Amino acid sequence: MSSAYKVAMSASASPLLMLDLEGLEVSATEKDMLAHPGAGGLILFTRNYANHEQLAELVRQVRAVRPDMLIAVDQEGGRVQRFRDGFVRLPPMAALGQRYDQSPTEAVREAALLGELMASELTELDIDISFAPVLDLDYGNSSVIGDRSFHGDADAMIALAGAFIDGMSAAGMAATGKHFPGHGHVVADSHLELPVDPRPLADLEAADMPPFMALAPNLAGIMPAPDITDAGHACCHGGLHPGNRILDHDCLIRTKPHFISGI
């Protein structure tokens, strides 16, 4: 686990903001924002990447302002891979699920290798974390999740995601499970509107939470789903009471960013 992640964990009792940058380098205004004590992390996007040399320089600029800044990216694989040119193109995790149905042992081995590969490419550039893996089950309902999910079966999910996490750990990267308590059943796109999962919370706990419960000891963070569940509980606005019980260990909680319109 990176030193920046340890610093973030030590400060996690107080809410911290995760910032983003407009372009390929850090502006003077952005340096001031990064230096603010309320800034706990930085998430990078495709707009922040041109090539390895530029990215390394961008990270250096950030570290010059805040050596302990947690630098993150969504580098799951498939359609959610922010850095592509010059990086290994990772498959969607559903490809591992399909492989699992044919050869579970080989699929689990490949999941570990992909997790280590993804993490090692980032840590070599001094990037602390990729927000991965997705632990949402694929019900065939959500186009937002879809092939980002390893599988629709909880046991297969636990096996594959657990191996992926092991691979990340081998490369020195902490894992973040998302989207707690499960985002695969909703249809609405949370980037555009607030999704509603009409199922009772008890059903959610029985069907969607087992991967989070099983893998909780290996997760350093969780990302809540921006859903309304159980007659009005908002998962990322105070409805995380199941998480207080299930994820009973030190854990960063990273909510969805402000620019998602559904929140």
Predicted regions, residues:
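N-terminal amphipathic/basic-hydrophobic helices that include classical n-h-c signal peptides
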Residues: 1-4, 256-258
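Boundary/entry segment of secreted carbohydrate-active catalytic domains
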Residues: 2-26
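Short, flexible segments with low predicted structural confidence
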Residues: 5-6, 34, 186-187
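Short secondary-structure boundary/capping segments within folded domains
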Residues: 8-10, 32-35, 62, 70
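Second-shell residues forming the walls of enzyme active-site clefts
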Residues: 19-20, 26, 47-67, 71, ...
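Short, acidic/polar
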Residues: 22-35, 110-121, 207-212
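N-terminal/domain-start segments enriched in small and hydrophobic, helix-friendly residues
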Residues: 29-39, 45-47, 175
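Enzymes and membrane/adaptor proteins characterized by extended Gly/Ser/Thr/Asp/Glu-rich
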Residues: 38-157, 185-197, 225-231, 259-263
